[in-house]
Amino acid sequence: MSLIPSIFGGRRSNVFDPFSQDLWDPFEGFFTPSSALANASTARDVAAFTNARVDWKETPEAHVFKADLPGLKKEEVKVEVEDKNVLQISGERSKENEEKNDKWHRVERASGKFMRRFRLPENAKMEEVKATMENGVLTVVVPKAPEKKPQVKSIDISGAN
């Protein structure tokens, strides 16, 4: 473990290393300019939220999207369809109001906006999209149109035999 803290992101993070846990550090910010430390921390927190992770799987019946959005209410999330085949998931978490007399020791929860867009294949039924949100997980289901089977017509073969 380094004795000199990094201005580019703080400490190591390894769940298997008991010395890398985020413990209270009386010297945090002492060796770095406070503005650099604040900017690195803020950038890291905002980046964690703005890069919302989304899983996309395809089943025989539908395209299913799942996004982890902990702490967001369904009113803070939008699911939209644009250009007939683009699914857009967006949202915003507002920063908590600060009181003049409050003394913050640590701010780790991220705030900001996020937006993810997915271009879906032709077989997506965009007019039937359904979205649910439960326990901070947004699930969007886009049904698929049934596959069109080609019509096959048998042709009799004429000739001498």
Curated annotation (Swiss-Prot):
Induction: Accumulates after heat shock.
Keywords: Cytoplasm, Stress response
Domain of life assignment: Eukaryota
Subcellular location, principal: cytoplasm
Protein's cellular compartments: Cytoplasm
InterPro entries recorded: A-crystallin/Hsp20_dom, HSP20-like_chaperone, Small_HSP
Gene Ontology annotations for the cellular component aspect, listed alphabetically: cytoplasm
Annotated ranges, domain sHSP: 45-160
A biological-process GO annotation: heat acclimation
Segments forming a coiled coil: none
Oligomer status and interactors: May form oligomeric structures. Binds to AKR2A.
Family recorded in the similarity comment: Belongs to the small heat shock protein (HSP20) family.
This protein's name: 18.1 kDa class I heat shock protein
Gene behind this protein: HSP18.1
